[in-house]
Amino acid sequence: MLDKLEGIEKRYQELEDLMSDPEVINDPEKLKQYSKEHASLEEIVNKYRQYLETKQEFEEAKEMLEENDEDPDMEEFLKDEIPRLENQMQEIYDSLKILLLPKDPNDEKNVIVEIRAGAGGDEAALFAADLYRMYTRYAEIMNWKTEIMDSHEKDMGGFKEIVFMIEGKNAYSRLKFESGVHRVQRVPSTESSGRIHTSTATVAVLPEAEDVEIEIDTNELRIDTFCATGPGGQSVNTTQSAVRITHEPTGVVVSCQDEKSQHKNRDKAMKVLRARIYDMYLEEQQQQEAEERKSQVGSGDRSERIRTYNFPQGRITDHRINFTTHRLEQVLEGEIDELIDALITTEQAEQLKKMGA
């Protein structure tokens, strides 16, 4: 592993030299390419250099202890210092193993999140709205930007479906494990007998797809326009501003009506369409690695029940990793890092196990 790290540091140094080369400075494309690669190696190189510095301090301390035969205070200090440095080296080494794990190429991307009310009628729609609020609050905490792409509200409040975009650094890496069925157990406000109801909502987190990743032939699209509707299906405007796009080869249908302009709705719908088709392609790839996926944190299967939100007990349980927290209120206010970090840590541990690290 240390040989690999040495090679990475060498490449990092090469890139620094290339980026200061006048020929590269005058070529924006090359400069962008090298800068991106340089940035991707920075964290691991800094950690490796920290490891080398600590190792040197450790070896020097050991040498000083061997040579010291006159100063009892120094001897006592070194006997404390050597195990401390050894533990620090091990911690840095373990961090390096995680940094060397294969990266998901989509981790840095923006995401499109789709939340759909499942079983449970009006209560499921209200829960879908709670999840939407939870993710948008989390986006605020992370300084990410959110934008609604399409939404269908219910008469009683809540959403039958809401599709929104989250733009920000590493959005996909933090949110990708949210895909699946979320279940809520609570007493609805309309329930006079105090009986607990169970409802569900399905979440899909799709990485935003670039034009270069997914080429869509416009001849394979059917585009329909219609009047936007509000809760209960009533028309909310008289112009044909809402857009429905059907990708005929895959049967994927996307509609968007949140903007007043047909052009803007079409742009948003195309973003969602591209992400859905890209997601289908990724799912096919994952199915080819089915055996590998069995041991990973959830299969990403949208029908898999991943989490239960139990209101009477103020408890949230993530079923994939048997993780429970009693911070229900805080989680619904967007404080979901505890859940996300637990999922990422489990995934990393499984990857390390597979690699025999």
From Swiss-Prot:
Keyword Cytoplasm on entry: yes
Modified residues (N5-methylglutamine): 234
Annotated stretches, region: Disordered: 286-311
Gene3D superfamilies, A to Z: 3.30.160.20, 3.30.70.1660, 6.10.140.1950
Keywords: Cytoplasm, Methylation, Protein biosynthesis
Listed Basic and acidic residues bias regions: 290-307
PTM characteristics: Methylated by PrmC. Methylation increases the termination efficiency of RF1.
Gene Ontology annotations for the cellular component aspect, listed alphabetically: cytoplasm
Sample GO molecular function, one term: translation release factor activity, codon specific
Disulfide bonds: none
SUPFAM superfamilies tied to this protein: Release factor
A Pfam family annotated for this UniProt entry: PCRF
Cellular localization per UniProt: Cytoplasm
Function of the molecule: Peptide chain release factor 1 directs the termination of translation in response to the peptide chain termination codons UAG and UAA.
Annotated HAMAP family: Rel_fac_1
Stated name of the protein: Peptide chain release factor 1
Gene (UniProt): prfA
